[in-house]
Amino acid sequence: MLRAGRIQKLTVSRISDYGLYLADEEQNEVLLPNRYISLTDKPGDEKEVFLYHDSEDRLVATTETPLLRVGEAGYLRVVDKTAHGAFLDWGLYGKDLFLPNRNQQGGIIAGRSYIVYLYEDSVTGRCVATTKLKRFINNDLISVKPRQEVALLVASESEIGFRVIVENRHWGMLYRNQLFRPIAVGD
């Protein structure tokens, strides 16, 4: 099944003037534009690609690696702000990530970076960002064990330390008196 916001391994099904058409195991096709193909690509080859919706709402593939995938939190810079929301640089050429007004907590300013979570909109299937993290980051069902090595994202700073997102799922705290190197929001 082809779904936006994820890296998938697909098979080249055919070549067109616009690029390669890649198919999943159910023969659903998506276009990989010419800018991302090589002269050696041929039908039957496997390609690892990231899927997203373009400005015309078509599902498109890219070989670029985004800064975030569905289900991940990150620290992204606002490149533009409109009446409907903000647009974030998520590392894809010519495609910014939408942060709708309804998903913004506090004021968003162009040029600044914010902690966001990337999810798939249940109605449109598009990748959407939110700064309202409570729905996605919680400690209801802890999935990590004591002393387990984990990935952290520093989300905010307080008097006692830094609030962190653990494994894109949980809240944690790094206390100032236990830090062995300087850290900042977004690390």
Locate predicted features.
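Single-stranded RNA-binding regions, centering on S1/OB-family and related RNA-binding modules
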Residues: M1-D187
